[in-house]
């Protein structure tokens, strides 16, 4: 019996990555790095027209250069005219949040194709700064509208946590681990084995990544 898939099932159809380590290579600004990663993702998908037909362009907030609307800068480079342009606030979890929300939008029928990207050129900025140079990267006029913002800027630590010195990841993550272990009903040894198996699989995949 063939398995029937939900026609609105969200699927990641392609991924792309670019990393420039060679100092002799012409440096790319963040928007172009993001666009090139998307081009590679489209190639990885085996399809065509995904980028130009994107309903949403979502970008992770970049730190190495400031665009008034990073999502628009990327959309222009990939030839997309999306209904939605959005950029995250700064935060290590926002890329995952955007993937989850994109999946929800596709499941709900609010979009067909959503592209998510991020890119930094911090090493290039640092190298130019040491040489006393400023990058000649693109800028956007003040008339460009800001993108929709994804995420919020709530303090990472609340008053109760501050009062108890629970401020750094090394303090917080163990609490998550204990709570997760309790929820799953695992012993300490069983939890360690489960986590070890999980990260071993991650490591196996990472070992095949040329970047």
Predicted regions located by residue number:
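Conserved "HGTGT" condensation-loop signature of ketosynthase/thiolase-family condensing enzymes
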Residues: 1-87, 104-111, 115-211
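Conserved phosphate-binding catalytic cores of ATP/NTP-utilizing and phosphoryl-transfer enzymes
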Residues: 96-104
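Active-site nucleophile and cofactor-binding loops and adjacent substrate-binding regions
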Residues: 85-95
């Amino acid at each position: 019996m063939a398995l029937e898939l939900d026609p609105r099932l969200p699927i990641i159809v392609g991924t792309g990555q670019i990393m420039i380590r060679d100092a002799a290579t012409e440096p790319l600004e963040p928007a172009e790095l993001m666009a090139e990663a998307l081009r590679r993702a489209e190639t990885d998908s085996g399809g065509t027209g995904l980028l130009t037909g994107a309903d949403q362009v979502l970008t992770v907030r970049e730190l190495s250069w400031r665009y008034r609307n990073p999502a628009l800068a990327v959309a222009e480079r990939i030839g997309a005219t999306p209904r939605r342009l959005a950029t995250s606030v700064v935060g290590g979890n926002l890329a995952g949040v955007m993937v989850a929300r994109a999946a929800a939008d596709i499941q709900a029928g609010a979009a067909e194709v959503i592209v998510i990207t991020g890119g930094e050129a911090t090493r290039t900025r640092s190298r130019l700064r040491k040489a006393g140079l400023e990058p000649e990267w693109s800028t956007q006029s003040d008339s460009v509208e800001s993108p929709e913002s994804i995420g919020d800027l709530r303090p990472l630590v609340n008053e109760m946590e501050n009062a108890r010195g629970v401020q750094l990841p090394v303090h917080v993550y163990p609490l998550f681990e204990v709570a997760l272990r309790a929820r799953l009903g695992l012993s300490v040894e069983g939890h360690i084995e489960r986590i070890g198996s999980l990260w071993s699989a991650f490591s196996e995949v990472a070992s095949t990544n040329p970047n």
